[in-house]
């Protein structure tokens, strides 16, 4: 099902409002989002060694991502507070060996957040917030090593459940 081009956050008078979900069915929902952090070889090595001044970068980022999912409705004004029944945060190094710059290869960390609920509305924003928060935490913990890190490609990878149906990003989609 294609998304409706009209925003559901505006009423007939054009005023902002929170969408009324009282009439919707409770369904099992899952969303997967990801973010990438490009960093210097020194920053990547610090993560791999696990010996940064602030502690285990990935463990702290994982906790921050989970907390981010739980706080989404406080951060995004029109998000519903939904029961978050599961959140997982995974990290993997992206092989960018096809990059024109050999120094960039294997210095990109991908954070993937998966969130699940049984609710009347989706959990996409929670998974996006989790991935973003985890990536920001990696930046915070390594900024003394590399202030030029770049966070990009914060995006929804897939979602399932609900009236609008399932979504899965095309693997060839660069955006």
UniProtKB/Swiss-Prot annotation:
Keywords noted in UniProt: Lyase, Molybdenum cofactor biosynthesis
Pathway connected to this protein: Cofactor biosynthesis; molybdopterin biosynthesis
Reactions accelerated catalytically: (8S)-3',8-cyclo-7,8-dihydroguanosine 5'-triphosphate = cyclic pyranopterin phosphate + diphosphate
Gene Ontology biological process terms in this record: Mo-molybdopterin cofactor biosynthetic process
InterPro entries for this protein: MoaC (IPR023045), MoaC_bact/euk (IPR047594), MoaC_sf (IPR036522), MoCo_biosynth_MoaA/MoaC (IPR050105), Mopterin_CF_biosynth-C_dom (IPR002820)
Short name of one Pfam family: MoaC
Active site: 140
Recorded superkingdom: Bacteria
GO molecular function: cyclic pyranopterin monophosphate synthase activity
UniProt-listed Enzyme Commission number(s): 4.6.1.17
Binding site residues for substrate: 78-80, 125-126
Record HAMAP family: MoaC_B (MF_01224_B)
Protein purpose: Catalyzes the conversion of (8S)-3',8-cyclo-7,8-dihydroguanosine 5'-triphosphate to cyclic pyranopterin monophosphate (cPMP).
Family assignment from sequence similarity: Belongs to the MoaC family.
Subunit structure: Homohexamer; trimer of dimers.
Official protein name in the record: Cyclic pyranopterin monophosphate synthase
Phylogenetic lineage: Bacteria, Pseudomonadati, Planctomycetota, Planctomycetia, Pirellulales
């Amino acid at each position: 099902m294609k998304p409706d081009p009209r925003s559901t956050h505006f009423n007939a008078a054009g005023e902002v409002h929170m969408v009324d979900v009282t009439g919707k069915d409770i369904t099992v929902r899952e969303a997967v989002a990801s973010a990438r952090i490009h960093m210097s070889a020194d920053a990547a090595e610090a993560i791999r060694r696990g010996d940064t001044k602030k502690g285990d970068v990935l463990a702290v980022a994982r906790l921050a991502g989970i907390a981010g999912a739980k706080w989404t409705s406080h951060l995004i004004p029109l998000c519903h507070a939904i029961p978050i029944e599961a959140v997982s945060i995974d990290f993997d190094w992206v092989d960018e060996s096809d990059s024109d710059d050999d120094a960039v290869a294997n210095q990109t960390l991908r954070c993937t957040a998966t969130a699940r609920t049984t609710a009347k509305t989706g959990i996409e924003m929670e998974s996006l917030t989790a991935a973003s928060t985890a990536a920001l935490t990696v930046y915070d913990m390594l900024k003394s090593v590399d202030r030029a890190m770049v966070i990009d490609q914060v995006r929804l990878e897939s979602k399932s459940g609900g009236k609008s149906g399932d979504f899965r990003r095309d693997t060839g989609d660069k955006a």
